[in-house]
Amino acid sequence: MKKYLSLIITLSSLICGAQNLPALAFGSIERIENFDTDLVEPRNIDIWLPENFDKTKNYSVVYMHDGQMLFDSSKTWNKTSWDADDTFGKLLKDGKIKDCIIVGIWNIPEKRYADYFPQRIIDSITEPTKSKILKLQINGEPSADNYVKFIVTELKPFIDKNYPTKPEAENTFMIGSSMGGLISIYGLCEYPNTFGGVACLSIHSPLASFELIDENTDNEVSSKFRDYLERNLPEANTKKIYFDYGNLTGDSFYKPYQSKIDKIMVSKGYSSTLWQTLFFEGESHTEISWAKRLSIPVLFLLNND
């Protein structure tokens, strides 16, 4: 009787898990619930496998932040999503990008700023700005260093062991938006031997939250971030780096900040073949806008030429 009860419970769990998976236009999802980690708070990991996934082939890997927002708008808090399966699926079907899988790393909503705010920038900020950001934005202790370390030392080894990947840097990428864009470029700078490129959509270049942006906070925090990039960006034209922004809602803040970052990219010697900054008129700080243009950075990172 206990054996049958255990079987029923197991089957029920599997059915519930399947019901909670995103509905997809292309491919399939394998979910690891509460991935075991010593570095950050456990979270779900969604692994997207393309149509006709073949275990005898090897695949590039794209790590994407805010994983619960990637695939199915009916499952997200704001009923919008990136529709990443649609974008990747169509590009793969047309033979325009390398064979790849997506590893969607869920955020922990109350930890999102702590995980995504580049930690070495926080460490360099003076008082009282530092305390203000820690209290009102981070809401505790920063954890970005552990978050990127988690990806590199715990999650990536697991993915490379359990899926047929191409583990080298030139086949390993990160994509994120807003704060997810910040942690993507930070991860590349901290682990240049692990990642071959990043795409930072609507990167939150002021760093401070919109509620905290004032003349002093803005000047110090964004300036410290640019100082960090000056010192830590990988050698020019060894990695692919993509930035973009719109001009509506939150994105309306970004042009002056991004212009200063672009000057750094030029001064470091990055050329248009491996670095892009694009502006999108009429686009906003939303998953709807990111979904509309996701094919552009994906083609940039994974083009099959």
Residue ranges and their predicted role:
Residues M1-A23:
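Bacterial Sec-dependent N-terminal signal peptides
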Residues Q19-D305:
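Non-catalytic cap/lid and distal C-terminal segments of serine-dependent acyl enzymes
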